[in-house]
Amino acid sequence: MPRRRIVTKRNILPDPRFGSDLLAKFINILMLNGKKSTAESIVYSALDSLFRRSNKNCLEAFEIALNNVRPVVEVKSRRVGGSTYQVPVEVRLVRRNTLAMRWIIEAARKRNDKSMELRLASELLDAIEGKGHAVKKREEIHRIAESNKAFAHYRW
């Protein structure tokens, strides 16, 4: 039980172009130093580039990419009797989305393409096809959770 008041979730307004809450959250995570218009232009041009490459609806393609990166389980450290165990825990939906978005953006920033628009479009395309660094990160997390399945009874 928290000693202070419980912080309420802030409502995020849907993005202006597609009216999607998920895309608005993605733009907010991508944003650096409060430059939201720059983040919006990067995301929208990346989605346009993705549309030209894959011939799918921008929003559908984005949601497919996000779905392929969402983790189902993750591990949390739990200290029991002097030793620390990596306990596999199911991930809530909001955290799944946030982690997937974070991993896609992180993987896009590590790429070596010319502009962030191209890097983001390439990473989203790879995520749709089930490859890329963000998908590898998810597979790695799932593998760690699978190997620590024996400690699942330590969940709280």
UniProtKB/Swiss-Prot annotation:
Keywords: Ribonucleoprotein, Ribosomal protein, RNA-binding, rRNA-binding, tRNA-binding. One of its GO terms (cellular component) is small ribosomal subunit. Pfam families: Ribosomal_S7. InterPro entries: Ribosomal_uS7, Ribosomal_uS7_bac/org-type, Ribosomal_uS7_CS, Ribosomal_uS7_dom, Ribosomal_uS7_dom_sf. GO terms for biological process: translation. GO terms for molecular function: rRNA binding; structural constituent of ribosome; tRNA binding. One of the primary rRNA binding proteins, it binds directly to 16S rRNA where it nucleates assembly of the head domain of the 30S subunit. Is located at the subunit interface close to the decoding center, probably blocks exit of the E-site tRNA. HAMAP family: Ribosomal_uS7_B. PANTHER family: RIBOSOMAL PROTEIN S7. Belongs to the universal ribosomal protein uS7 family. Part of the 30S ribosomal subunit. Contacts proteins S9 and S11. This is Small ribosomal subunit protein uS7. The gene is rpsG.
